[in-house]
Amino acid sequence: MDLARQKFSRLLEEQENLKKHGVCIRVLGDLPLLPLDIQELIAQAVLATRNYNKCFLNVCFAYTSRHEISNAVREMAWGVEQGLLEPSDVSESLLDKCLYTSNSPDPDLLIRTSGEVRLSDFLLWQTTHSCLVFQSVLWPEYSFWNLCEAILRFQMNHSALQKARDSYMEERRRQQMERDQAYVTQKLQQEGFASHGDSRRRRTLLQKCTTMREERIQGFLQALEHKRVDFFERLCPVSA
């Protein structure tokens, strides 16, 4: 933990450079597991840079992918419990938005060094359609040419990965449309229409359903962001 204290203290000393280059620091993980003084250093770094948006430094600390996913599920359950979401709003797409990495795109390329051929519970959800490159070189010895090899492998597989990603997103959209259509059919039946209903009424209900869902989700995500910021502000009220 001494190394973490040194590094986060150094980041706080570099606030002018962070501001100059617009670096936003994000620390991803189960932070309450850490010693309180390190939590406070992290909170200061995160709050001091949260409005910068030129580049982003994501630091996974006290992090496992299984915890990240289970935490995202708990956050969605909290949203339903608080009345911010309907149970029907819960989806893979919403889970994406509840992950620690929600403000960053999924990685195109993940490099694992040291000859280990496993992800070690790291970004399991986010790397579904990423290029995974396993190399035997140790990290301290990683060179420009090792990076070139990894990038070349990514380029060779990019087309297939992009096709798989596009197909997956299209399937997500189709499933969401099916859920919306089922909701509209139920509403029409409650109003006494046949299952196919009036086409104009169906379109109106479908648009209303989509709009209301998006509004609920945006309200929930704002509440979730406020909840996370509040966690950091409680750790360093002076900086808040």
Regions found by a protein language model. Give the residues of each.
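Flexible, compositionally biased loop and terminal segments
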Residues: 1-240
